[in-house]
Structures are given as structure tokens and as C-alpha cells.
């Protein structure tokens, strides 16, 4: 049963159980102030104790290790735990072992796709991971699948934003920072304990616009048109396709950037907002293991 539900401002607590439709209830009938300290207290008692973190909060991610150490299972789509500072990641691993609790992080990369599970099961079976590469952003997958080099790139960015594929501030997607966190999670899961700044990111946002107000960035979006048209033309001339690719190479080198891929490359195939990941290992050395499917959406993520 659900005994505690909270957003950033309000909380509901009832040991007898709360109706699942808590979204509407949190703004009604005398909710109490939300407190992260109250979460573990609300779960005192017997039975299977689980915290479901559907936030994107650094403060909540900082509590993951504490909950795990208390034997409370954590299920999350938040990338700030596994994809945050290395010390936080390490504390989560240690707390999970110490508390005997499970850390359900599959949805942090690829929504409902079995990407992290596959990496773990390969290694548990004695395989060694050599490299991982992927298209890990549904919004950027949509953007570069539809961009045709004829219409302005800025038009496609606005269309993706208006359709809800990007964040309200498209720089959150175009900067590659979200993909960087996902690649960190993949790398650490594959056995490379990388520091947060170890991933080299080639941002699509010009330096002059990285700190501009959202409205000013929207007005300045056309500055992306000419350089993107040139990159598209060069790729098209060679029969290639542009994709924003995250790569973990042998030795742990990690990069995120726009690449021109051969049309038959497993990362170039597919459309829409699909995520695609290729895994090379001892057993998948000549042809990679490829995982593909929807990388976003409430139902598959849940």
C-alpha cells in the first residue's frame, strides 16, 4: 500500500494507505509540508519497504544511499544518483550491499529498455564489456531523424519543443548534458568508475548562448542553422546520417557528440524517439548486441 506521497511542497501520510491518485490529492485537504526526513519514518514497520523516486532532484538523490542502508528498496528514473558525482555513486553501491536492499535504476537509461540489465547479466555470466555506443536521447533522435537539411534546423528544434520531445529549454537536450549522465551510468555499470567530468561532451549550443535567458536563446536559435546545414550536407554527400552518439571505448574513454554514421550502422537505423544501444564484448565482438525501442514515455518507463 502507498503510505507516503510528496511533491516539492506538500506531502500526504496515512499508514492505512493513500489512494493511488495522489496527484490531485496533494493540493487538497490539509496536506503537510514535504520533508525528506519523514520518508524513512513513514516506512517504519514490517513488510517490504520501497521508495519510488520520480523526481529530478539532487536533494532526493542524496538520500538514496541512506534509504538503501536502512534496508529500504529504491526504484528511480532519476539519473542524479547513478549518474551524479562518483562519490555518490560509490555510496549507493556500498549502501545497497550493506542494507541488503535493491536499487531499481533500469529506467535511468532507455526508459523500459533492458540496457542496464543486459550489461549486468553479460558480466554476471563471465562476459567482458569492450565498448558501448548509443543514441540515448529520444528528443535528439527525433530531431536528427527528421532534419532534412532543407528547412532551418531551428524550425525542427522548435517543433520538437512544441511536441514535448525536448525540455522547455531545448539547451537541456542540445547541450548533451542529459546524455552525459546516461553515459556515466552505462560506463559505471560496465566496470569503469568514471568521474563526472571524465566524459567529453561536444555541445551543440554555442558558448555565447549557454547562459542566455530562455527567451533570448529562442530568438537566437537561427544561429544554429548554417553550421548544421553544412554538417548535414557533408554527411549526406557521403551517404551518412547525423546522430548524437554517446560512446564508451575500450579503456574507459567516454564521449558524447554529433557523428556522421553510415546508413547501415545499427545506431543510424530506426526512427521516431527510439533509443538504440550497441554493446561489444568477448561474446559479441564482431557483431554487437543491439537493443532498440522507445526511450521515453510514461507507460514504458513505469
PLM feature spans:
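A short glycine-threonine-serine/GTX helix/turn-capping micro-motif
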Residues: 130-132, 167-174, 290-294
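Catalytic, metal-anchored helix/loop core of enzyme active sites in primary metabolism
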Residues: 133, 141, 159, 247-302
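Substrate-binding/catalytic subdomain of NAD(P)-dependent oxidoreductase enzymes
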Residues: 146-147, 154-269
Amino acid at each position: 500500500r502507498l503510505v507516503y506521497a510528496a511533491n516539492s511542497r506538500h506531502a500526504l501520510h496515512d499508514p492505512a494507505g493513500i489512494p493511488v491518485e495522489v496527484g490531485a490529492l496533494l493540493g487538497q485537504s490539509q496536506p503537510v509540508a514535504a520533508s525528506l526526513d519523514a520518508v524513512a519514518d513513514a516506512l517504519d514497520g514490517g513488510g517490504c519497504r520501497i521508495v519510488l523516486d520520480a523526481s529530478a532532484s539532487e536533494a532526493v538523490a542524496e538520500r538514496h544511499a541512506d534509504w538503501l542502508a536502512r534496508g529500504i528498496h529504491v526504484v528511480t528514473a532519476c539519473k542524479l544518483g547513478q549518474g551524479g558525482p562518483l562519490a555518490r555513486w560509490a555510496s549507493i553501491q556500498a549502501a545497497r550491499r550493506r542494507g541488503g536492499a535493491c536499487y531499481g535504476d533500469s529506467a535511468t537509461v532507455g526508459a523500459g529498455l533492458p540496457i542496464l540489465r543486459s550489461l549486468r547479466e553479460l558480466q554476471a555470466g563471465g562476459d567482458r564489456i569492450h565498448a558501448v555506443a548509443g543514441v540515448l536521447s529520444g528528443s535528439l533522435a527525433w530531431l536528427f531523424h527528421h532534419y532534412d537539411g532543407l528547412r532551418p534546423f531551428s524550425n525542427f528544434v522548435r517543433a520538437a519543443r512544441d511536441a514535448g520531445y525536448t525540455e522547455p529549454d531545448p539547451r537541456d537536450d542540445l547541450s548533451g548534458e542529459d546524455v552525459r549522465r546516461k553515459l556515466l551510468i552505462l560506463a559505471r555499470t560496465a566496470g569503469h568508475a568514471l568521474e563526472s567530468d571524465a566524459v567529453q561532451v561536444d555541445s551543440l549550443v554555442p558558448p555565447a548562448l549557454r547562459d542566455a535567458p530562455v527567451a533570448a536563446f529562442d530568438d537566437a536559435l537561427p544561429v544554429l542553422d548554417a553550421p548544421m546545414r553544412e554538417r548535414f550536407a557533408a554527411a549526406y554527400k557521403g551517404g551518412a546520417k547525423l546522430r548524437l552518439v554517446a560512446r564508451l571505448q575500450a579503456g574507459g574513454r567516454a564521449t558524447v557528440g554529433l557523428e556522421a554514421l553510415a546508413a547501415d550502422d545499427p545506431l543510424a537505423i530506426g526512427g521516431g524517439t527510439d533509443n538504440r544501444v550497441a554493446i561489444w564484448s568477448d561474446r559479441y565482438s564482431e557483431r554487437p548486441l543491439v537493443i532498440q525501442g522507445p526511450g521515453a514515455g510514461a507507460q514504458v518507463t513505469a
